[in-house]
Amino acid sequence: MANATSGVAVSEECKARFQELRAGRAHRFVVFKIDDAMRQVVVDRVGPRDAGFDELTASLPADGCRYAVYDHDFTVSDATATAAAGEGGEAPRSKIFFVSWSPAAADVRSKMVYASSNEGFKKELDGVQIDLQATDPSELTLDVLKDHTS
């Protein structure tokens, strides 16, 4: 179904790849783009489970908008984690980030369509936990992810 604000639909493949990431943990990340006709969000790239964060950031073009989801694994060390993990005091956690990538070099029309489709697309991805917006590589680093998980 098309987004009421932008008229952009979401392909079934987008939903399927997201579910594989969320429920099956089959992928580390999925990058999405709006097709050239500006009618539908489609899958642009899927990162294998062993992919690093740098592979996600390398998948985001310097002159084009994208959406992405990233399954970020990290550990916590606090009283709850200590009780759950035993002596080590660290417990594994995972958060799914939704990234809206809109670099300064992208054309204005593309930025407008991505911005107006953003909320509708996120609603199709049930299970996203943290929302990030980035316009520059410095806004999308492991330190930024860490800040959102601590």
Curated annotation (Swiss-Prot):
Domain ADF-H, chain residue ranges per copy: 7-150
Record keywords: Actin-binding, Stress response
Cellular component aspect of the GO annotation: actin cytoskeleton; cytoplasm
Keyword Chaperone: no
Cysteine pairs bridged by disulfides in the record: none
Single GO MF annotation: actin filament binding
Gene3D superfamilies: Severin
InterPro entries: ADF-H, ADF-H/Gelsolin-like_dom_sf, ADF/Cofilin
PROSITE patterns per UniProt: ADF_H
UniProt similarity note: Belongs to the actin-binding proteins ADF family.
Protein name: Actin-depolymerizing factor 3
Source organism (scientific name): Oryza sativa subsp. japonica
Gene that this polypeptide is encoded by: ADF3
